[in-house]
């Protein structure tokens, strides 16, 4: 059980002067007048707690005045802890309207008395160290909500009694009333400060059954809100409850105080600004029809939380910050007179630091949709957006500044954030903070403000200078500016006139991307850095032309130009893509949204696991129900994730082998999700087969976890069912064979059909039993019999890469067990070796290598390394394991088959081929031609294998192929 507040240890405060003893006499005298004998005795004892009260009264004129006038506020604290008493006060507030005789005047008086008592107790608990600032804010928020609630209930009942509105329940007037009161800012976040304004917006749910004529309801409820303002805000002899602010509502200069929901939604969707999105992050129903309030916020969700990263918001947020900079109290960091909310290094900078990143990424990361600043700083660190040090620094700084804010406001109960210029008042703030002298407080204060400024500047103010002085860049008029042509030539462009033409086209707004004045303004700011970056690469003109094609396809350029301004490193990446990777350039030209993922701070530090991808996809598909929309969303998600894996390859963050695992994990998830969507849609029409279960085997590079950027997926669909099953049980029943054939075709279409969002994966079913001559769906029984009695050796080789990737988990396990049993069947090494040699000869005849860079088909290339691995598995030289990659198998080759030197050579060959092949497949759509490739690609290839020039790479490939060819012949000589 907690001790009574006045009998527990209270944080000692240094008094401002010796006047405390006189103030104690005054409060003791008033207590005696009110017959508060226990309190009189308590003060007479002069314990340490009394010294605390004495110090508080010397430091805060407001607290002194209220305590001397109302010593009864302290009496309960002789017997109970402060939270118990505050709970009683909140309960009392909630019951004020229960009296049938209550009128507006009595309500206002009662609210002010209760608020004043709670206000004093919260201050004492805060100053004494019994409350942290978070607990103080929570109680202030509860008090604010309770006051709003009781006042609104009173007004709703009165309107109902006068026939102005109709309530579903007089006892619970807020329920289904259709009147929504949202708390924003500190109230919405549950973080009210000591003398805080309360930000509110009032909406009318026109769909409520109790809302009749809408224009009449707007009038009635707007008048009700005006009375609510009077009840809560008006200063009387007993003070006020809270100051209310309704200026955050849509277009406050021309809209009523109570606004219909549909009108509000139209406003936000059509005219809403980014600062309003930022405000809505903290929005929460605090009074009225809360069910309707939550419904409204759900409808507003897409406006606040955009699915794609929103970097255009940064400029707007920054412009708000610049307006704050213009305030007379912003200036430099100081102590006396500094605005600890709006000033440099203040509370608002921490809030903007958080809210900006919430606006940018909250649509993609639900963890960032919280209302509270500290919790979101923690999440930003957890997600990798900020470092642990940054998170800890800002959390500690926020706590310090909120405590300072409270103490400034406790001096006179004023909504101010200015540290006093007056030395005595400034000292009072320092002492209320627990310091013994002002100098220590100033030292810590300045340190905190500097820490906040540093972290805020890293996000907003220390961006790379994009307006570089590089010479004339004039793109107006019809003629080329001669000095601009010289500048472009100096930058590295060979066709300066063509570049001028491109830039003129952009700046005159002929593309959708630059039709808005804002987009052209952002482009103008970006142009010097843009041209310098492109000019620095080989064949700069060619890359710039690709960039021009990219911009032609953009529906809007504001987002991109803002993104590049806010993240200059992305400009370098974009230039690299345009100069070295035509395939990626084509992708972002068709689907520019994939570039958003580049803003994920973990992009180069973490490889996406299947679990990570599952979580991301779950959030991405949130609220998506129609079958076609699911398929489109899967394509969008896969495009972006493939692009991000590709960026990791380009940056050298992952090897080719790791990229194979990442591409495979993504494909596994996409196929599994597509299968689930197809099953649901197909069974809706055709029902289910009794005991029917489906399993999909991934074959080829999908099965061995070695996919590349442009890989097809090789699949086999296997099914089983109860013995007595004959036909499905749906509205349009199908016999078993027909059912699974159509089901498989539906699955193939879901994966490979070209929709508005492209193709998910090209599908190849030719590795199934009997290939193109066999059924597209194979029963488990047929699968077993075929591989045990009819399969060719090449089919056993292919089966070594089989892996269950989607379907019924238990059935998949049975399927994989059967694959293991089939691979365990005895095979004569000579027969296998002969078959492999014949197969290799046939392939070489029918599909000869195109050039020395045909890493797959050339003699001693990828195919030969894979044949060696597969041969080792079906001849049981290496134990078979589901999902083993080629590298895994090579690692287990025994020295009895190959000496260690040969095994090392195979490993090196596999690594070399994989790194080169992943890079080539990533960057190019067509076959690689060393005589006609993007200049940037050669640099990427060199860095991927650590060689200085292409001749050395070609020599390395040649030597490696000869080594592999020799090993292949050695193994296959049986």
UniProtKB/Swiss-Prot annotation:
Record's keyword terms, sorted: ATP-binding, Magnesium, Multifunctional enzyme, Nucleotide-binding, Nucleotidyltransferase, Transferase
UniProt xrefs under CDD domains: NT_GlnE_GlnD_like (cd05401)
Source organism (scientific name): Bartonella quintana (strain Toulouse) (Rochalimaea quintana)
NCBIfam families on file: PRK11072.1, PRK14108.1
InterPro entries named in the record: GlnE, GlnE_rpt_dom, NT_sf, PII_UdlTrfase/GS_AdlTrfase
UniProt-annotated stretches for the region Adenylyl transferase: 468-974
Region entry Adenylyl removase, spans: 1-464
Reaction equations catalysed: [glutamine synthetase]-O(4)-(5'-adenylyl)-L-tyrosine + phosphate = [glutamine synthetase]-L-tyrosine + ADP; [glutamine synthetase]-L-tyrosine + ATP = [glutamine synthetase]-O(4)-(5'-adenylyl)-L-tyrosine + diphosphate
Annotated GO MF terms: [glutamate-ammonia-ligase] adenylyltransferase activity; [glutamine synthetase]-adenylyl-L-tyrosine phosphorylase activity; ATP binding; magnesium ion binding
Keyword set includes Transferase: yes
Cofactor or coenzyme needed: Mg(2+)
Record protein name field: Bifunctional glutamine synthetase adenylyltransferase/adenylyl-removing enzyme
